[in-house]
Regions:
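Short, Lys/Arg-enriched N-terminal segments with co-localized hydrophobic residues
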Residues: 7-21
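GST superfamily/GST-like fold recognition
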Residues: 174-178, 201
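Acidic, low-complexity terminal tails and accessory targeting/binding regions
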Residues: 17-21, 59, 95-96, 103-117, ...
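Generic beta-sheet signal
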Residues: 24, 163-174
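Phosphate-handling substructures
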Residues: 89-149, 206
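Active-site-proximal alpha-helix that buttresses catalytic centers in soluble enzyme cores
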Residues: 31-90, 96
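Short beta-strand scaffold positions
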Residues: 73-74, 148, 171-172
Length: 218
């Protein structure tokens, strides 16, 4: 049940709702105070602010008629809170998976992108306009690191027969979510594809025979 985090995994032969292809609803978490302050959050564990809570609740209202089979969330509190609020009242298992945690900014986490004296002059421009070649923060990750682990996460879903007809809610982050979506495009270097997703924006992906198609993009 949501709210009581369960470390479970469906195995081949377990029952899920049938009669549909695998469908993934990939959401970016709700707003936090650091989002509002334009700070690099990365893997710092920051809770949702009041606006983020309300936005997640509204998103849940908009998704109330969708029959989900399970929830997978980044282990960070802002992603788990978002999942719990969107899925409120449903008796669903929630799995946490570090492969969809946000990109780590290492020593730069907590820096404000508007007035930092620590961030290199071209870092933010690279981050937004050429993320695939963006420099790695000291002690942090590159986008290529996140592409690799989110691809591993995606492959573990499509290779599990128990999931082939499941509808799955995935609560993740801006960079990690876009890296996950890169699995469904030929050009994996164009990570943002037009922009950073807004808080609580949702992308819908349908997977059939191991091939994913983006049905709806935020």
């Amino acid at each position: 049940m949501l709210g009581n985090e369960q470390k479970i995994r469906l195995l081949p032969g377990d029952k899920v709702q049938k009669g549909k292809k695998m469908k993934l609803y990939i959401i970016r978490h709700g707003e936090t105070s650091w989002n509002k302050q334009k700070k690099l959050q990365g893997q710092r564990d920051i809770m949702l602010n009041d606006a983020g809570i309300r936005l997640a609740e509204l998103t849940g209202e908009g998704m109330k008629d969708i029959d989900f089979d399970l929830v997978i969330s980044s282990p960070l509190i802002r992603a788990k809170q978002t999942a719990e609020l969107v899925m409120a009242g449903r008796h669903l298992p929630m799995i946490t998976d570090r492969r969809i945690i946000e990109l780590s900014f290492g020593d730069w986490e907590g820096e404000c992108v508007r007035d930092s004296k620590v961030l290199p002059a071209d870092f933010i421009d690279k981050f937004y306009h050429d993320p695939y070649h963006c420099m790695r923060a000291p002690g942090g990750e590159s986008f290529q690191d996140v592409l690799k682990r989110t691809e591993d996460f995606y492959q573990s879903l499509v290779q599990n027969k128990a999931y082939e007809n499941a509808t799955i809610f995935i609560s993740t982050h801006g960079a990690a979510g876009r890296c996950l979506l890169a699995n469904f495009y030929d050009d994996k270097e164009d990570i943002w594809r037009g922009g950073i997703p807004k808080n609580c924006s949702v992308c819908i992906v349908e997977v059939k025979d191991g091939v994913g198609t983006v049905l709806e993009k935020d």
